[in-house]
UniProtKB/Swiss-Prot annotation:
Biological process per Gene Ontology, one example term: translation
Top-level taxon of the source organism: Eukaryota
Subcellular location: Plastid
HAMAP family: Ribosomal_uS8_B
NCBIfam families attached to this UniProt entry: PRK00136.1
Keywords: Plastid, Ribonucleoprotein, Ribosomal protein, RNA-binding, rRNA-binding
PROSITE patterns in the cross-refs: RIBOSOMAL_S8 (PS00053)
GO MF terms held by the record: rRNA binding; structural constituent of ribosome
Subunit description: Part of the 30S ribosomal subunit.
Protein name, entry field: Small ribosomal subunit protein uS8c
Principal place of residence: plastid
GN (gene name): rps8
Amino acid sequence: MGRDTIAEIITSIRNADMDRKRVVRIASTHITENIVKLLLREGFFENVRKHRENNKNFFVLTLRHRRNKKRPLRNILKLKRISRPGLRIYYKSQRIPRILGGRGVVIISTSRGIMTDREARLEGIGGEILFYIW
């Protein structure tokens, strides 16, 4: 039985955010590297470092928290896995959903690599909807 590395990333980030931890450590694979670069570019992480320990590569992610007047350093990320190994979900470029009117991000695996919903619409290509983040 294979591992769902995308679900592991989502779970690690969600658990660290709910625990108010600023740093998350996830295993490094080709797909996780692409997803982490994309989320860093979209502003969900402050910093990403590659770390090697016992011949295994890891990413050390620093979560971005927004300051709030009532509760400092509080920003709960919402992540939802859509396509999974048992049920793949594909959309054409015209049918890609918008999350919170465009404030959220849909991560899509296309024939040209992993990209956001905005990039996929601009290029006019669809693909597998991996997850939502807002």
